[in-house]
């Protein structure tokens, strides 16, 4: 084994992780082993395309959303379910499942909120964290639902969204603080 005092990690300024740097991947293990075998430093440099090939993809998500809205478009209740297809391995599935629910009340003022979620192992390619992991799929679903509700109420969807934004320095239904 390589003694710990012989290991030097140089972390360069390369931006945030956003999920893509959360899991250890095969090429990182190979680089460590190559360094042990050669006794020399090993550098990994991936192109943007290679990053997409070797990192995990987004979770397919089955969602059910039931929303209570007043005639003026005020969101009185949101009942949201999300079921994530995690593929064959665990990865950051718990966090992705949590985010599908925890962040749905941040954008708009929601008076009452209920969330249920689960992540399932399947015989598919593994899924994991990606930029905005766990939030992109449900955000799309909620926005489409709000647009349909606005049309049913005879309201402009964009204006209704702007009018219903969560106020600054407020707390969401699940006690997340909105920055002032």
Which stretches of residues belong to each language-model region?
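Structural alpha/beta core scaffold segments of enzyme domains
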Residues: 1-180
């Amino acid at each position: 084994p390589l003694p710990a005092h012989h290991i030097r990690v140089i972390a360069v300024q390369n931006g945030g992780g956003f999920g893509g740097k959360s899991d250890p991947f095969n090429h990182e293990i190979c680089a460590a082993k190559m360094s042990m075998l050669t006794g020399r430093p090993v550098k990994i440099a991936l192109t943007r395309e290679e990053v997409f090939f070797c990192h995990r993809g987004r979770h397919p998500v089955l969602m059910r959303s039931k929303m209570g809205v007043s005639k003026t478009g005020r969101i009185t209740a949101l009942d949201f379910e999300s079921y994530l297809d995690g593929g064959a391995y665990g990865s950051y599935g718990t966090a992705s499942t949590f985010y599908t629910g925890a962040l749905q009340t941040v954008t708009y003022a929601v008076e009452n909120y209920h969330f249920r979620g689960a992540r399932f192992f399947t015989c598919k390619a593994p899924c994991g964290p990606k930029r905005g992991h766990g939030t992109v799929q449900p955000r799309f679903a909620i926005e489409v639902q709000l647009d349909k509700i606005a049309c049913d109420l005879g309201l402009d969807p964009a204006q209704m969204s702007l009018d219903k934004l969560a106020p600054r320095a407020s707390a969401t239904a699940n006690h997340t603080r909105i920055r002032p």
